């Protein structure tokens, strides 16, 4: 209610009409915001209704109070309305020609020109609402598995650069890994102009962190990029020219961290590539996007791991990973002496449930074995067999993918004196792509973190190795598989040959050789099912395996029908058996004694 001055009979106290009052309010700044929306609220009273009310004269105080009270109720109702209700009321107002305007000083209806702004405003609001994007999914919600398994999930982030990591992340515990990524984020943010910076005031880095982190690469620092996350790789490229900044395969990523309380807008992950070798890459993800990015990375690794468990043959766990070991940037070079491996620390026992138990479960009927050192490894015509098919085979370590799988003795150890170990003909050097870094071992970390990025190693420990090892034996012959037992036809054919001595030890066979060219074929006493050709060359005894693990009789360049076919061919043609640059000529057979 408007304040009233004290009544004075010499003063004209006639109150202004409601229409004049509304006009004055519309002219003033505060009253210009009042709009005419008659149907928006039950408290609204139109100006026409007010004008139709009986006018008792300008001095009628009751009539004035009645009108002003309705006016206040109308304005309060407008303020309490939602934006959607106001738009609907404005649309109805613009569509009705008889709707009057409260701001009209003469009490007439609103002109078409006054309705045009309201109609255009309503149309603008409607079009703006239709152009708004759909609401985003809640933070942390996983994406569709098909999308992550296929083309991947794409984010637009800012790439701040990378900093070199001089030590393997697997050699550090989880706390140290987190400190390394935090320090990398701080260093890169300080070096990049315009970066927010992870820490305003931070302590100087420790000597340990200074020895782990190296030089930084700021070639693409501050550039907005498209980050695509899939089960295959993390791809970083420019959104306009599609230039690839880096493409890190999942098997080359060792650690990832992001969304920490002190670094809420940053994601850091450690990966290897040919340019930066092992480096920590920093991404700036504003508006809480860091949690989504790190969650998508974790989802990609989880789906990749499940895919491996469902179908191990589709994961390049053997040949592709072995080929990757040839490249210096995928091998943990120089990390061996720094790792506290159990097989290099005195009195250190291996962790339970490791390679030993998995190997024993996979080979329940393996022959007797023993651990030894200093013995020459055996190769079959250029293919590495460990020592599986040697004359006194004692089970050598086998490389499975990136792991070193060691077996344990299952029976009584049978040691061969070093002096009695003969020299093999087929002892050519190991190809680097077949047996790289045979002395390295996989460290068992006491604490597992979510983004360790090495899930396949633990899976290989607990998964049956039968199908994978069989495939390895047929491709590179790097796994010791028991040879096939000879059939009755082969034994009958061999017994008819004069140079076949039957079951005989190596020492007994060497005693029968007198001069170069002498040879015989015998059955191994320590490895059942194996047949060995023993001959003399340059005064030294040579021993060659004649049957490969798949039961095929062959040399380096030819396959034969049987052992008799192989011996007859080389004996009649006088062609030597060549292996590893050494020759063995078959001239005089040593006949079997009756």
Swiss-Prot record:
Entry keywords, A to Z: Phosphoprotein, SH2 domain
Record InterPro entries: CEP152/SHC-Transforming, PH-like_dom_sf, PID_Shc-like, PTB/PI_dom, SH2, SH2_dom_sf, SHC_SH2
Residue ranges occupied by any SH2 domain in the UniProt entry: 499-590
Tissue note: Predominantly expressed in the adult brain, in the hippocampus.
GO molecular function: phosphotyrosine residue binding; protein tyrosine kinase activity; receptor tyrosine kinase binding; signaling receptor binding
Any one of the GO BP annotations: synaptic transmission, glutamatergic
Annotated region described as CH1, given as residue ranges: 335-498
Keyword Aminoacyl-tRNA synthetase: no
Record function comment: Signaling adapter that couples activated growth factor receptors to signaling pathway in neurons. Involved in the signal transduction pathways of neurotrophin-activated Trk receptors in cortical neurons.
SMART domains: PTB (SM00462), SH2 (SM00252)
Disulfide cross-links: none
PTM remark: Tyrosine phosphorylated.
Name by which UniProt lists this protein: SHC-transforming protein 3
Gene3D superfamilies cross-referenced by the UniProt entry: Pleckstrin-homology domain (PH domain)/Phosphotyrosine-binding domain (PTB), SH2 domain
GO cellular component entries: cytosol; plasma membrane; synapse
Taxonomic source organism: Rattus norvegicus (Rat)
Modified residues annotated as Phosphoserine in this record: 402
Domain PID: 149-334
Start and end residues of each stretch annotated as Disordered: 95-147, 428-447
Subunit note: Interacts with the Trk receptors in a phosphotyrosine-dependent manner. Once activated, binds to GRB2. Interacts with activated EGF receptors.
Alphabetized CDD domains for the sequence: PTB_Shc, SH2_SHC
